């Protein structure tokens, strides 16, 4: 990308500046160099304005800081400007810098506690099957569909979001499906993006360490719907909050797995009597765009909902209903989302990202209809995060699985024994579960004890390829561990 002129960039905010060339925008002073515009704002944990002098010392071309009437900027040898409400305007600033890439794309925003990654990948997969070139941004990675690069956060900074969109547009993407987290919405990271469609999947307990209450968490999610015209909103009518929002947004598209949606005059998309089998599901689709049978190679009732969410977004964007039905059997299962390993002579192990009580319950319920033997659940909880959901996670495992193994997830700086104690507190019969802190050994234990008719849900990490113990982020993958343990098990049969 050619350099941008400082004066042109600042003119959008009524600031007069000289025509210095800018090559990048940085929020982290450690990444600043010649050509950088250092943007100094108050973060959730740290005030970036404390590092203005460090950025200047590292060669920054200019500084733009958050003006609040109290902060006094240091005297610098480079241009240094203050701007009120800078965090809320950062998406706009980055949009101007990167020449508004989202205006040249179909941009689908997806929010909700569960299902964001799967829905985003299904949208991108569908666009690819129909002959386009689609990008993905979210927890599972950023990049063109089929070539994702690991992402640090579900929704990056406002600057990262615009930079990623620009990169995808330059690579030829004509559609981008983007997970939008509640954090990202509250922190205005997508405030200036012209979304073509917005999807709400569901709301259940998560991130209360940040939002405080479920009401605040739900209000954060609703911000995405406010960024699109009402007919471009796609809302889950099976979700309690979704039903409330459909009353407030009567022109939105409603989708659901439980048949016709009552008291909604807008467009609808529903599944009727889905049939589940080992290869996926088949279901009758009734919609405002037409009716037909949809088959997809995905496990579980909640994936019927995810497919409907993705299909709703595609229909809002103008894609053909019959073409979507015809291509649905070619949709690809998502890495680390109800991903199957083994089977046959060995137990079937299913790796899934379920890390909330609601997601864990849905995953276990989904697998129960496929299970001829015992249903196992291996699960842990992260450290330095919402303690309130730990007993709920254990309770869900105990309620819906026949055999439970509790193990470590990402303990971070918290004592694994304390995390485990919080989980055990949610059990009715603590003596009925097994505890193995070492996640590798826990997976090996489950596979060694299960029969070939059994299904083992390995929950919590999904696609992740790391484990955080203390402050050490080390390589670890449930998918790799399960595959290796199954290989060893199969060798023992020969």
Feature-to-residue mapping (PLM):
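Receiver (REC) domain switch/active-site residues of two-component response regulators
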Residues: 61, 196, 402
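Short glycine-rich anion-binding loops that position phosphate/pyrophosphate groups of nucleotides
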Residues: 43-44, 182-183, 205-206, 239-240, ...
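Phosphate-binding loop of NTP-binding sites
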Residues: 10, 89-237, 241-251, 308, ...
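Active-site beta-alpha connecting loops in nucleotide-dependent enzymes
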Residues: 43-46, 334, 358-361, 365-428, ...
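Short acidic-hydrophobic, aromatic-tinged amphipathic segments that line or gate anion-handling sites
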Residues: 80-85, 434-438, 442
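Glycine/aspartate-rich loop-and-adjacent alpha/beta segment that forms the canonical ThDP
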Residues: 455-488
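N-terminal leader/targeting and accessory segments in enzymes
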Residues: 1-92, 96, 240, 293, ...
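Acidic, Mg2+-coordinating active-site environments of NTP-dependent enzymes
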Residues: 69-76, 177, 195-349, 372, ...
